[in-house]
């Protein structure tokens, strides 16, 4: 596993939180209580995408977004959405490794000072602690020696990272997005992708949000503006047959 500028206390790492929550007068936690999030995938709709892009294995890279214990522990572990999300991300990881696709992970370092947190401290509190358990990518999604872990600085993984450069170096112009949270970091990263001429693909049943409403809103917003929305089944089919 290769780490790219994965810093513990000397970079600005900002939490994933719902976009647009800017009216609170005092900070609230950037994660929900442990085990509190559950909603069925039967409530999730896969919208029609404006983007005409076709996923191709020789052009694509996979980004596993913020699947750290600190964020994932908010989900009821035996229920959807996280039960299905973990299974589907693992299937996509296995396929990516089989085809020798680049695999990247975004991971926040934790232990931010007040200055490093900046305005996010006012909105969401201190964020992830400086704790290896909280930082860890959850099983069974742990990075392999061939994968690259990137420091997560703000909502978008493109912000203050070399993700765009390493995509260019790998001759990849497509990015598959999976993980949490759908209506914050996933949405922001897909926005930066399209603004940098990287075709974004969001896998609808391999991402999750705080609520089914937020999940659906994220998919609908991105389908219209930034990304092609796929299911795990359609993504695997495209990768295995291109």
What function would you assign to each model-found segment?
Residues 1, 21-38:
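C-terminal segment of N-terminal export signals and the immediately downstream linker at the start
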Residues 30-144, 239-241:
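Active-site acidic carboxylates
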Residues 5-26:
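N-terminal export signals
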Residues 176-179, 197-212:
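A short glycine-rich beta-strand->turn/loop micro-motif centered on a GG-aromatic cluster
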Residues 138-178:
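Internal catalytic-core helix/loop-beta-alpha segment
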Residues 100-101, 171, 197:
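Glycine-centered short loops/turns at secondary-structure junctions
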Residues 228-242:
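A charged, well-structured terminal subsegment
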Residues 183-189:
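Short glycine/serine/threonine-rich phosphate/pyrophosphate-binding segments
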């Amino acid at each position: 596993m290769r780490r790219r500028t994965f810093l513990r206390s000397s970079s600005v790492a900002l939490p994933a939180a719902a976009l647009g929550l800017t009216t609170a007068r005092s900070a609230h936690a950037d994660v929900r209580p442990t085990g509190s999030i559950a909603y069925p995938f039967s409530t999730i709709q896969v919208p029609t995408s404006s983007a005409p892009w076709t996923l191709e294995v020789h052009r694509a890279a996979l980004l596993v977004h913020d699947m750290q214990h600190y964020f994932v522990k908010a989900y009821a572990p035996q229920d959807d959405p996280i039960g299905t999300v973990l299974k589907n991300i693992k299937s996509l990881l296995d396929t990516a490794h089989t085809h020798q696709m680049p695999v990247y992970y975004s991971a926040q370092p934790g232990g931010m000072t007040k200055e490093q947190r900046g305005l996010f401290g006012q909105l969401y509190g201190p964020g992830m602690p400086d704790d290896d358990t909280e930082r860890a990518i959850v099983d069974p999604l742990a990075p392999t020696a061939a994968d690259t872990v990137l420091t997560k600085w703000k909502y978008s993984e493109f912000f203050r990272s070399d993700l765009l450069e390493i995509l260019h170096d790998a001759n990849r112009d497509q990015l598959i997005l999976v993980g949490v949270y759908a209506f914050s970091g996933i949405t922001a990263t897909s926005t930066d992708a399209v603004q940098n001429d990287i075709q974004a693909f969001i896998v609808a049943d391999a991402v999750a949000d705080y609520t089914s409403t937020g999940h659906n809103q994220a998919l609908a917003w991105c389908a219209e503006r930034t990304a092609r929305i796929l299911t795990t089944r359609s993504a695997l089919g495209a990768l295995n047959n291109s």
